[in-house]
Swiss-Prot record:
InterPro entries named among the record's database cross-references: PSBT
One term under GO cellular component: photosystem II
Protein name according to UniProt: Photosystem II 5 kDa protein, chloroplastic
Subcellular location: Plastid, Chloroplast thylakoid membrane
Residue pairs linked by disulfide bridges in the UniProt entry: 95-104
PANTHER family found in the cross-reference section: OS02G0581100 PROTEIN (PTHR34940:SF4), PHOTOSYSTEM II 5 KDA PROTEIN, CHLOROPLASTIC (PTHR34940)
Annotated organism of origin: Petunia hybrida (Petunia)
Sections of the chain in a coiled coil: none
């Protein structure tokens, strides 16, 4: 399970939870209805299935994302030759701010 927490730091979406104030440490009352024994067993088995497949689903999603990024790179069009009108059109923002850039001149 430690690998999943490490994975979140690589994805960049992790945030730090704010520290709790000690004075605001109040607990509310929770009302729980009694359940039949058969329903309780079904819920537990569903939780066990989701625990086992959660990590597998994470790695399948990561593999799919990696495959998509590789395919996108492979399908990228070729760079235009430097100094050509196509290069100046593609990199117009660079050529306007820095006209001496290598892509804008021969």
């Amino acid at each position: 399970m430690a690998s999943i927490t490490m994975m979140s730091s690589f994805l960049g979406g992790s945030t730090v939870a704010p520290a709790k104030v000690p004075s605001a440490n109040r607990r509310g009352v929770v009302m729980v209805k009694a359940m039949h024994e058969g329903e309780n067993n079904v819920v537990i088995s569903k939780n066990e299935e989701s625990k086992n497949s959660g990590r597998r689903e994470l790695f399948f999603a990561m593999a799919a994302a990696a495959a998509c990024s590789v395919a996108k790179t492979a399908m990228a069009d070729e760079e235009p030759k430097r100094g050509t009108p196509e290069a100046k059109k593609k990199y117009s923002s660079v050529c306007v701010t820095n006209p001496t850039a290598r892509i804008c001149r021969y």
